[in-house]
């Protein structure tokens, strides 16, 4: 039986996009820096609009929609049927975004079909992240990108990503994160290497310490201005990307 609680994602409905008391509001706040970083990687690698992108564990499309709105052909997959139903219902007209229920360990997608694969805030939610990286490498084309975001296994990450989440979002389910499933950058690099991926960058990510954060702490609700920024050292979360050889 899995130690991590992934079941609640299927039942969020429109809370994916509304409300400030549930932990998913932090995912909404975090989506901005994920999209920003993904676009930076795409620009660096020459992956332009029209490229095919697979968003693994996409939820209700918090990252998929902004990318599709910029002209990327995005397919989102997630094991949570309710999240996929919400994503389909929320898909804006005129954007190339499709969604399907699929397992991150075996997506069912053709080998080498995607210019980029996104593993954003999901590797710490699975028991076998190495197998997810292997599947990402399988469906990425040679020279394609695998973009990731996850949490380091440090005391700071334990404090902020587990206990801090409960402080700023009063409606946080139990076991949203499990400390033992957090991944050190060195471990991720080793797993990626075994999967045939060359990690090119790891960059720290942390909350912005400002009035919005303290407002959230005091009221135990996520302020609309709650933001994340990059950090020199990946002591809490980190983003990065790898290239398929």
Residues covered by each model-derived region:
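Conserved class I S-adenosyl-L-methionine
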Residues: 147-169
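Acceptor-substrate binding/catalytic loop of class I
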Residues: 150, 170-187
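A short acidic, Gly/Pro-enriched loop at the edge of an enzyme's catalytic core
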Residues: 105-116
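A short glycine-rich, Lys/Arg-flanked "PGG" loop and its adjoining helix->strand segment in the class I
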Residues: 130-142
